[in-house]
Amino acid sequence: MNHIKVISLVQYSSSVKKLKEEFLRNFKRFDSVEDFSDHHYVSKGKASKQHSKNWVKKVQDEWKILNQNLPETIFVRACESRMDLLRAVIIGAEGTPYHDGLFFFDIQFPDTYPSVPPNVYYHSGGLRINPNLYNCGKVCLSLLGTWHGNARQSWLPKESTMLQVLVSIQALVLNEQPYFNEPGYGLIKGTWLGESKSKVYSENVFLLSLKTMVYSMRKPPQHFEEYVQNHYFVRSHDIVKACNAYKAGAPLGSMVKGGVQDLEQARQSGSKKFKTDVASFMQTVVDEFVKLGVKELAEKPKPPVNNANTENQSKKKTRKRSRSSR
């Protein structure tokens, strides 16, 4: 009966998953909302504030660029009553320690924009998942003026855009080897020492990424509540498969849609500590998936009963009883 129950749960989950996949397909990459009461920068301005015509035009141009050019893995919401506010979510890319995760950013266009870059805050949940993303929410990026770089990497008022900022965070910050984002560490990239340290750092980052998933599911940012729920429902099995593979020794980043990405990379192995840490935290993630409705993950099917073995055991018990009665 338990085995049949699990099959029915899987079938039900499969039909629900199709509906949620449709929701995700139809979720607009760019859209506007009425308010942002939980926005990090909401207290830094007022809805009634009058901005210059040039400022309004520039922000509207930014909206247009985002609406037409956002990649499939970045979603943005603008605020109708507060044109200075945006919220963005970036999906972690395959092959990185951020794979399948959602990473949220609150953005504000200052009064002097675009003479100065936008303000960007990362929803960290108190976790430091990258040298450029502080647990206080600070985002270090040359383009934002929060990190030093050459002139071409800095904010250029007549050229730089909000789209460029978001794509830079995705490509340059949430990358395959975030360890080397730390200043000076790039000098040892490619060496045994550098790659060893990078591996340990990335393994820890993946664990923090799992914790970020839990944080987002428990406290999804406003206007992305349904998106968070549907995203993790749809990706739950891939995330669990990846965790099981990492527990078994697969190297971090080798899993793509539940399969091994690179045979040469797969010959390597995750560290013993990584396997243990993933195993110890995995159940917390699974519990959150179950709360979302992925019920079959809560069921542990028992192996089917072997009738022949059952009959033999029954005969043995009968013989024992007959002997004891003599």
UniProtKB/Swiss-Prot annotation:
The active site is at 140 (glycyl thioester intermediate). Residues 54-214 form the UBC core domain. Coiled coil: none annotated. PROSITE patterns: UBC_2. Pathway: Protein modification; protein ubiquitination. Residues 297-326 are annotated as: Disordered. This is Putative ubiquitin-conjugating enzyme E2 38. The lineage of its organism: Eukaryota, Viridiplantae, Streptophyta, Embryophyta, Tracheophyta. The gene is UBC38.
